[in-house]
Amino acid sequence: MGKKILFILSVFISANAFSQVNGEAEPPHISMDSLFKIKEKESIGKLFPQFNSTFNGRIITKDSLRGKVVFINFWFAACPPCIAEMSALNELYKKFSSNKNFEFISFTYESPARIILLKKKYSIKYKVASVTRQECYRLNQNNGFPTSIVLDREGVIHDLFTGGDIEDKKEAKDFIISMVYKSINGAIMKQ
């Protein structure tokens, strides 16, 4: 047992000595963005979890959306990047809302009364459901906010986009048009 501890300790000391430059050790740097990209890749191709929520008085479940491409957005009011993308999301909704094979929904942990005020304030046109914070995280794969997910017709995650650093409306719009629009279009065109 003592030899194992001595061996592990010597490996640790050697590794530490070799990792130093000019006497200063530098810890490995992993950005949050790269962690989100890893999580995004892990989620793509997996079934989206079951849910049962009320949107505008209508109960919607994952199973009730089968056969449609679904865009799901997760947000909350105190999130500047979430607010920055709302105008672009309204445009996205307008672009695809007439397609009977497409559904646009969003989840927030804001109260139903607050949702009514926010929909008016930001002219939100798409469906918004109030769920618990825990449910938001469960459904958005434990990502931050905003998170947008595109599901294919079978309820499989086709694409996942995590935000957080875009607070400018134009940047948010450019991102949504360049990435999200293409993803939705690709999922719709895929048979």
Residue ranges and their predicted role:
Residues 150-191:
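Thiol-/selenol-based redox modules, centered on thioredoxin-like
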Residues 105, 116-154, 162:
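Short, internal strand/loop/helix patches
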